[in-house]
Amino acid sequence: MRERKNFWDRNAGLYDCFMRKDRAVYEKMYELIRPVVKDKTVLEVATGTGLIAKHIVKAAAHIEATDASPEMITEAKRGNYSAKLRFSVQDMFSLPYASKSFDVVIVSNALHIVPQPEKSLREIKRVLKDDGVLIAPTFTHAENSFPGKIKAFFMNLAGFPLHSKWTSEEYLKFLQQND
């Protein structure tokens, strides 16, 4: 856990620049998420710099956006002018919220970088209402394309903590098995 936090603390200031290449994909994701969170109480786990939370907050009733990295949360708080959005440092394996307290939980691009993603999903299920919605998009890294292998090599070299390499089908199966 400490090693993972150190990676994200070291790279917090660069994260938004790194994510710019995926801007079009993220814009589409925001469009898809907004109607789901409309007037709902939302928890975003592993918010990073808060990109998703900041782009959907107008639709939601309230958002709690958390990350294990204090530096990521510092970056996330910059430019947050909404009283409906609160950022805090939290451990996704032990959330401080009451059971069944959120209508929607978002965990985006995070389950592949934690050592025990099924444990995180159990905690998410605990805080998600019975009729709640889990939004869990993630990058998949198991495809064997040459560009994918090159990207994985450089991510590994940079210390990126990739723990699960799923294909899209494997990821969906993982989510279904841990429902």
Task: State each model region's role.
Residues 93-104:
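A short acidic, Gly/Pro-enriched loop at the edge of an enzyme's catalytic core
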Residues 40, 61, 103:
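Conserved acidic residues
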